[in-house]
């Protein structure tokens, strides 16, 4: 039997998706640049070791069933698979998923599969199937982030971990993440983020509480444009990360 990374297209009708067509087109148009370390996705490659170390420290992923929601070109999914996790990456940006699949084939990563499916649709099909769910840099790109949080909570097993990272809706975030990163430093393509879609930590915490995800750890992430270095901090005014754990008694 061939042990190749698996790709499934399980795409529901577009009108029912919790997705912004403009956002999907944006990331699909850049699909060929996902694995260019000096391209538009350079910031994701730079922060990936920090995200991975933090996740793996709180919940070692080796041997775990892991779901990466909004996986894009597979940067985080690939890294978790290399640590020994059984990883499923899902996204609705078709071209980005094809890039992720090709990279997995070239890297010969048999414990990594991809599906083109919404997180809500997968939650209806496979509730309680994963030990760990990651949803990184994705919530600020969807019309209904609370729906994504609920689906993530449904997909994880009781006692399992769900990790989120997103951007705070704050004046500092507007200046640094939009004006600075997109228009001054050109770290990201212009239009990557919309201020109105950013999410305050208090809002994300409320979404989590409503679906019995207990907040265990919060971290911020900062960037020095002179040294081009990212690091973790306690400052959540721009980029921040949540580590949550599903209540053992939760039934969604």
Curated annotation (Swiss-Prot):
Keywords: Methyltransferase, S-adenosyl-L-methionine, Transferase, Ubiquinone biosynthesis. The keyword Secreted does not apply. Pathway: Cofactor biosynthesis; ubiquinone biosynthesis. Transmembrane segments: none annotated. Gene3D superfamilies: Vaccinia Virus protein VP39. It comes from the Bacteria. GO terms for molecular function: 2-polyprenyl-6-hydroxyphenol methylase activity; 3-demethylubiquinol 3-O-methyltransferase activity; polyprenyldihydroxybenzoate methyltransferase activity. InterPro entries: SAM-dependent_MTases_sf, UbiG_MeTrfase. It catalyses: a 3-demethylubiquinol + S-adenosyl-L-methionine = a ubiquinol + S-adenosyl-L-homocysteine + H(+); a 3-(all-trans-polyprenyl)benzene-1,2-diol + S-adenosyl-L-methionine = a 2-methoxy-6-(all-trans-polyprenyl)phenol + S-adenosyl-L-homocysteine + H(+). The keyword Methyltransferase applies. GO terms for biological process: methylation. It is an enzyme of class 2 (transferase). S-adenosyl-L-methionine binds at residues 51, 70, 91, 136. Its EC number is 2.1.1.222, 2.1.1.64. Belongs to the methyltransferase superfamily. UbiG/COQ3 family. O-methyltransferase that catalyzes the 2 O-methylation steps in the ubiquinone biosynthetic pathway. This is Ubiquinone biosynthesis O-methyltransferase.
């Amino acid at each position: 039997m061939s042990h190749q990374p698996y790709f499934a297209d399980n795409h529901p009708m577009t009108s029912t998706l919790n997705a912004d067509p403009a956002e999907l087109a944006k990331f699909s148009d850049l699909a060929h640049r996902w694995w260019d370390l000096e391209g538009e996705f350079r910031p994701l490659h730079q922060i990936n070791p920090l995200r991975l170390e933090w996740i793996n420290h709180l919940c070692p992923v080796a041997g775990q069933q892991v779901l990466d929601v909004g996986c894009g070109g597979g940067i985080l999914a690939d890294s978790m698979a290399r640590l020994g996790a059984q990883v499923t990456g899902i996204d609705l940006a078709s071209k980005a998923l094809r890039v992720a699949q090709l990279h997995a084939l070239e890297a010969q990563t048999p414990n990594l599969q991809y599906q083109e499916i919404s997180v809500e649709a997968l939650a209806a099909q496979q509730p309680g199937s994963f030990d760990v769910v990651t949803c990184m840099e994705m919530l600020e790109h969807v019309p209904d982030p609370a729906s994504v949080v609920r689906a993530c909570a449904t997909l994880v097993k009781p006692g399992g971990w769900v990790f989120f990272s997103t951007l705070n809706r704050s004046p500092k975030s507007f200046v640094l993440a939009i004006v600075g990163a997109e228009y001054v430093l050109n770290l990201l393509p212009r239009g990557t983020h919309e201020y109105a879609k950013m999410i305050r930590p208090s809002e994300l915490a409320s979404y989590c509480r409503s679906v019995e995800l207990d907040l265990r750890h919060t971290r911020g992430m900062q960037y020095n444009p002179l040294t081009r270095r990212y690091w973790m901090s306690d400052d959540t005014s721009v980029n921040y990360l949540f580590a949550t754990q599903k209540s053992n008694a939760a039934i969604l």
